Amino acid sequence: MAKLALGHHREATDPGCLRAVVAELLLTFLFVFSGVGSAMAAAKLGGGGDTIMGLTAVAAAHALVVAVMVSAGLHVSGGHINPAVTLGLAAGGHITLFRSALYAAAQLLGSSLACLLLAALTGGEEAVPVHAPAPGVGAARAVAMEAVLTFSLLFAVYATVVDRRRAVGALGPLLVGLVVGANILAGGPYSGASMNPARSFGPALAAGEWADHWIYWVGPLIGGPLAGLVYEGLFMGPPGHEPLPRNDGDF
């Protein structure tokens, strides 16, 4: 099983690391601008995420923008756009904890800038929507929902992007985006289906609403690293291991 790598402060001056951090800031900005913007547009057009059509539109927008941004950043920073993804990959030894902290700071800044810009561009006509559990959904259930949804997301990231034995290639980011969209359809009416502390942080900052914000840190930061540990421990296989060859007729 992979071990955590602490890293070193010298990473902060490494040109490759700096490019990756700037990429995470920009990619997260663009992701949150489209994702939150789609939720604001759905609310403006009527119903928002409280209707099946609004929820489907928001889920589709998130799925598409996640797929594109992960693909765009894959060979620069990994296209994390999410502190839970970053920590989940750190749990598997794929990124140092020091670089993870730099990524998370960039992701939070990108999300904040996106939401502040959205608030300015819309002139306050539509409030920036903040993640919160639905009425009747307690904090514990919301945390559990976010943990499960984020586990699903990270499991997909490992299986389709990280695990080099899988012949997925360029389809990996698209499949990750589809999981995000499906999870929003499944969990949106209950916890909001954030799966991403940065995605929740920007709107909370722009709206000044922090009452339930902790849920969207605790749940994803449980589910993400847990998925990394499970996939690394059970599915990655020892170094140098190659899966058995398959025939076309095999299941």
Curated annotation (Swiss-Prot):
Xref: InterPro entries: Aquaporin-like, Aquaporin_transptr, MIP, MIP_CS
Motif (NPA 2): 196-198
Entry domain remark: Aquaporins contain two tandem repeats each containing three membrane-spanning domains and a pore-forming loop with the signature motif Asn-Pro-Ala (NPA).
Tissues/organs with expression: Expressed in leaves.
GO biological-process terms attached to the record: water transport
GO cellular component, one term: vacuolar membrane
Originating gene: TIP4-3
Name of the featured protein: Probable aquaporin TIP4-3
Keyword Transport part of the UniProt annotation: yes
Keywords recorded for this protein, A-Z: Membrane, Repeat, Transmembrane, Transmembrane helix, Transport, Vacuole
Motif NPA 1: positions: 82-84
Topology class, membrane: Multi-pass membrane protein
Organism from which the protein derives: Oryza sativa subsp. japonica
NCBIfam families per record: MIP
Family: Belongs to the MIP/aquaporin (TC 1.A.8) family. TIP (TC 1.A.8.10) subfamily.
Compartments where located: Vacuole membrane
Superkingdom to which the source organism belongs: Eukaryota
SUPFAM superfamilies attached to this UniProt entry: Aquaporin-like
Entry GO MF terms: water channel activity
